[in-house]
From Swiss-Prot:
Function: Activation of RuBisCO (ribulose-1,5-bisphosphate carboxylase/oxygenase; EC 4.1.1.39) involves the ATP-dependent carboxylation of the epsilon-amino group of lysine leading to a carbamate structure.
Family that this chain belongs to: Belongs to the RuBisCO activase family.
Lineage of origin: Eukaryota, Viridiplantae, Streptophyta, Embryophyta, Tracheophyta
Polar residues bias (residue ranges): 1-20
Gene name tied to this protein: RCA1
Boundaries of the annotated transit peptide in chain numbering: 1-53
Pfam family, one: RuBisCO_activase_AAA_helical
Recorded GO CC terms: chloroplast stroma
Organism: Zea mays
Molecular function GO terms recorded: ATP binding; ATP hydrolysis activity; ribulose-1,5-bisphosphate carboxylase/oxygenase activator activity
Compartmental location: Plastid, Chloroplast stroma
This protein's name: Ribulose bisphosphate carboxylase/oxygenase activase, chloroplastic
Length: 433
């Protein structure tokens, strides 16, 4: 570290040449300092010896450490935009500070919004967790925190099934029951205007969960609707570089879960293993090598009648609906998703809102709701009866049928103006009301 090196200079030291690098001649104090090395001076005609760098403790990082930048992400493409400003033709430059052209100098500047804490009302007693669902999730999470002899445990658990069946909500209940603090991601974060940004975000969120585990807090990475962000939904969607990199990053993490590095740095120390839970509706749209058995354990979630009744009891637990009425409601709409019953409960409050609107006046709604000194309106909990629930349930089913039956887009393409768009209303008798 303290070794000196020689520099050959053609001109004598007494008449130094003009340096194009420094832009000016060396004065005499500079020359005398340059030819002095560890208290020993050389003649003016001898060759220069450069000053040796002072001793630096390599075990401590200081402001003078030339490698300090390795701990930060200096390879960010947004910083490259900043670095290249003024160095390339203006034709290829976007205005700085506009949209995505905001310089982000470090990955650590992305303050994570992924951590989510749960505080449900009567979480364990009031909400139902399906036994099969809980068994699969608890076993997978536990296996990933254990050291099993000669066993390769898949890092990723893929939970897939029909829409609105409560996959994400059931996961949140299990996390809360196990005392897990998940790091959350959604499908919308798996695409970006900058190539490589989603893959970097996955690694960053994974390392955040790893840091929580280091501190003694059980954690996992939870990605909602993976197929919507990284899957191919037919010919109408474009397969981008980010789709490829998201799939490749998840494959790499599944193969090397204890060696996940952030861009711009490399840490030889192993990070704790973090199980990954993903949800989706159709995993056949994902890259096939990602969902192979060694990397992803797959679980198809189709709630049974018992599961549907149990979840619906939790939905109506504060409304005083009798248990036999919940069973009747579930059996009346057997083909509906669990989310249907949550929407059904929300419909019951329509009458209360409608009554408040008539009392307040339509012209006063904005002032009462947005800029009111009295605060937002409060409602007494309406009495929910099985007759009212069945009535609203059939209304929701009718709306679903209308969407499937009245396909106006096809009519607009085939016929002029409205075509026969009002024909459906005439048949149902609601057109002349």
């Amino acid at each position: 570290m303290a070794a000196a090196f020689s520099s050959t200079v053609g001109a004598p030291a007494s008449t130094p040449t003009r340096s194009s690098f420094l832009g000016k001649k060396l004065n005499k104090p500079q020359v005398s300092a340059a030819v002095t090395y560890h208290g020993k001076s050389s003649s003016s005609n001898s060759r220069f010896k450069a000053m040796a760098a002072k001793e630096v403790d390599e075990t401590k990082q200081t402001d003078e450490d030339r490698w300090k930048g390795l701990a930060y992400d200096i390879s960010d493409d947004q910083q490259d935009i900043t670095r290249g400003k003024g160095l390339v033709d203006n034709l290829f430059q976007a205005p700085m500070g506009d949209g995505t052209h905001v310089a982000v100098l470090s990955s650590y500047d992305y303050i994570s919004q992924g951590q989510k804490s749960y505080n449900f009302d009567n979480m364990m007693d009031g909400f139902y967790i399906a036994k099969g669902f809980m068994d699969k999730l608890v076993v997978h999470l536990s296996k990933n925190f254990m050291t099993l002899p000669n066993i390769k445990v898949p890092l990723i658990l893929g939970i897939w099934g029909g829409k609105g069946q409560g996959k994400s909500f059931q996961c949140e209940l299990v996390f809360a029951k196990m005392g897990i603090t998940p790091i959350m991601m959604s499908a919308g974060e798996l695409e970006s205007g900058n190539a490589g940004e989603p893959a970097k975000l996955i690694r960053q969120r994974y390392r955040e969960a790893s840091d929580l585990i280091k501190k003694g807090k059980m954690s996992c990475l939870f990605i909602n609707d993976l197929d919507a962000g990284a899957g191919r939904m037919g010919g109408t969607t474009q397969y981008t570089v980010n789709n490829q990199m998201v799939n490749a990053t998840l494959m790499n993490i599944a193969d090397n879960p204890t060696n996940v590095q952030l861009p711009g740095m490399y840490n030889k120390e192993d990070n704790p293993r973090v199980p990954i839970i993903v949800t989706g509706n159709d995993f056949s749209t994902l890259y096939a090598p990602l969902i192979r058995d060694g990397r992803m354990e797959k679980f198809y979630w189709a709630p049974t009648r018992e599961d549907r009744i149990g979840v619906c009891k939790g939905i109506f637990r504060t409304d005083g609906v009798d248990e036999e009425h919940v069973v009747q409601l579930v059996d009346t709409f057997p083909g509906q998703s669990i989310d249907f019953f949550g929407a059904l409960r929300a419909r019951v409050y329509d009458d209360e809102v409608r009554r408040w609107v008539s009392e307040t006046g339509v012209e006063n709604i904005a002032r009462k709701l947005v800029n009111s000194k009295e605060g937002p309106p409060t409602f007494e909990q309406p009495k929910i009866t099985i007759e009212k629930l069945l009535e609203y349930g059939h209304m929701l089913v009718a709306e679903q049928e209308n969407v499937k039956r009245v396909q106006l887009a096809d009519k607009y393409l085939n016929e002029a103006a409205l075509g026969e768009a009002n024909e459906d209303a005439m048949k149902t008798g609601s057109f002349f009301k």
